[in-house]
């Protein structure tokens, strides 16, 4: 999020606009504010390669909090704003962050976490209440605007590109930090990754990008950062709402956006009058990733929006990247594309190459061993013995044309009576049922089979859960899937623990059923 040249060439062009309030920050303002925070971090002792963390909801200070690190040679970690104090403390401590930037809304959680963050020496709070300096911690808690207000608006003397230190989402275990080397290019010089993505996603100058997802996630960070580097305008939604999303496309003549499949599903389930009320003709490119998209959902979206949808697959660890446009997807329905970066190997449990069409663990050749920050055990587990390949545990296969299909995460594979079952297919089917808002499928203990297939469903609004709905959903699965893939029982929840990024926090659900058992899946 380095935009110095645009601040000079187009100082009054909107850099970003907050969707709810309409608050607009120009490129000149963004540049000045990012520089002020960079000066503050330097004055507090942070030098290149040091770390700080950002724990905020989407707000008008978020981008400059990232932008300051990107011009100071710092590693910054954007933390999921839905975490508890103990979860926040783990990431802040594990990342060795020296400064924590948070907001009034999340201050209580941050304050509870600070005693377990020994490296933190300063906590900056956006719109801090006057009584924010509580007695529960010795760490200074300072209002953000007050702290940066007296700092210079010009660049620091020793500008150097910084980079985010991303953490895996933690949906299958403890979050893991992915530390990347600082870029060697001078600030302002185009990065190879951004050139690659701008061509793939068809970005251009003066584009209008609508960002509906939390900014703490790696995908929105990359998309927003690329938009700012190119000189476009970002519309930031504080939280996703399907009707507001469509209204914003029309109001701002949005050209580009990035979504997740759950957002597609929520828009598709709107009444026809709501879906057809807004002019979406300005949209040029809609990118999606983060979670598997059910085939019927993708088909309906392409029919509605036209062939402007691009899908990609790439883990936070950035060890491989595939993509496909709408035409390629329609010719290979269900694919996540062909490899664009990284060399893919589909291997069985004995590390042998799987035949075409046969699922296996996805491994990627890497020039250096994948290293998780301060977690050597997990680093070894995710790398081949010789360090030449890495995996995040995804399972999939490649077809005759080289297109990749994801089957599931190996962590969630069900072994029932010796048969391997990947629950993603069953989840994708349940989600398109008109009475289902969301669904999770996983293995639960079975004395005879080891595990059996369980579905947990969030009913659609106005739908009554109970035995009748359970039978209807099981019958629906049996009509469309092989019997062994179908749930033997269905439980109901008011809300499933799905992250705003679209990923299902399935481990929380599954663990409830394994309290007194040992799962066959690691």
Predicted regions mapped to residue ranges:
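Conserved AMP-binding/adenylate-forming core of the ANL superfamily
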Residues: 15-59, 63-67, 84-89
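Structural core segment of the AMP-binding/adenylate-forming
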Residues: 43-44, 64-67, 71-147, 157
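AMP-binding/adenylate-forming catalytic core of the ANL superfamily
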Residues: 83, 89-90, 100-102, 247, ...
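Conserved AMP-binding/adenylation subdomain of ANL enzymes
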Residues: 186-212, 216-256, 270
């Amino acid at each position: 999020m380095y935009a110095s040249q645009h601040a000079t060439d187009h100082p009054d062009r909107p850099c970003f606009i907050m969707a709810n309030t309409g608050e607009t920050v120009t490129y000149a303002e963004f540049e000045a504010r990012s520089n002020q925070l960079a000066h503050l971090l330097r004055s507090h002792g942070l030098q290149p390669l040091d770390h700080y963390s950002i724990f905020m909801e989407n707000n008008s200070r978020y981008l400059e909090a990232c932008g300051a690190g990107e011009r100071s040679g710092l590693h910054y970690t954007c933390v999921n704003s839905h975490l508890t104090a103990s979860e926040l403390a783990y990431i802040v401590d594990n990342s060795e962050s020296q400064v924590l930037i948070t907001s009034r809304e999340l201050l209580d959680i941050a304050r509870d976490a600070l005693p377990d963050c020994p490296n933190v020496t300063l906590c900056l709070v956006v719109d801090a209440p006057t009584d924010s300096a509580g007695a529960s911690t010795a760490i200074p808690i300072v209002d953000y605007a007050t702290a940066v207000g007296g700092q210079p608006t010009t660049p620091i003397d020793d500008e150097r590109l910084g980079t985010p230190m991303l953490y895996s989402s933690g949906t299958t275990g403890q979050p893991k930090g992915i530390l990347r080397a600082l870029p060697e290019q001078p600030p302002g010089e185009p990065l190879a990754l951004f050139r690659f993505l701008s061509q793939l996603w068809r970005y251009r100058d003066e584009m209008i990008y609508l960002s509906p997802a939390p900014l703490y996630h790696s995908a929105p960070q990359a998309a927003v950062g690329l938009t700012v580097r190119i000189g476009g305008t970002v519309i930031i939604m504080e939280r996703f709402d399907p009707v507001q999303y469509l209204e914003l496309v029309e109001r701002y003549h949005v050209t580009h956006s990035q979504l997740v499949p759950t957002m597609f599903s929520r828009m598709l389930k709107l009444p026809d009058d709501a879906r057809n009320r807004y002019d979406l003709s300005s949209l040029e490119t809609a990118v999606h990733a983060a979670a598997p998209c059910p085939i019927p959902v993708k088909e309906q979206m392409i029919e509605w929006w036209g062939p402007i949808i691009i899908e990609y697959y790439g883990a936070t660890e950035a060890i491989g990247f595939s993509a496909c446009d709408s035409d390629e997807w329609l010719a290979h329905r269900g694919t996540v594309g062909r490899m664009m970066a990284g060399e893919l190997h589909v291997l069985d449990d004995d590390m042998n190459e799987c035949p075409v069409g046969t699922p296996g663990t996805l491994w990627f050749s890497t020039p250096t061993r994948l290293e998780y920050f301060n977690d050597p055990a997990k680093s070894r587990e995710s790398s081949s013995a010789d360090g030449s390949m890495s995996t995040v545990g995804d399972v999939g296969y490649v077809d005759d044309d080289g297109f990749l299909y994801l089957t599931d995460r190996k962590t969630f594979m069900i072994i029932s009576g010796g048969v391997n079952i990947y629950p993603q297919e069953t989840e994708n089917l349940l989600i398109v049922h008109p009475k289902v808002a969301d669904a999770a499928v996983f293995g639960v203990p079975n004395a005879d089979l080891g595990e059996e297939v369980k579905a947990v469903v969030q009913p659609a609004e106005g739908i009554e859960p109970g035995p009748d709905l359970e039978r209807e959903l099981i019958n629906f699965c049996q009509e469309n899937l092989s019997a062994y893939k179908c749930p033997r029982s269905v439980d109901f929840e008011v809300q499933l623990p799905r992250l705003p990024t679209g990923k299902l926090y399935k481990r929380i659900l599954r663990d409830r059923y394994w309290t007194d058992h040992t799962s066959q899946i690691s």
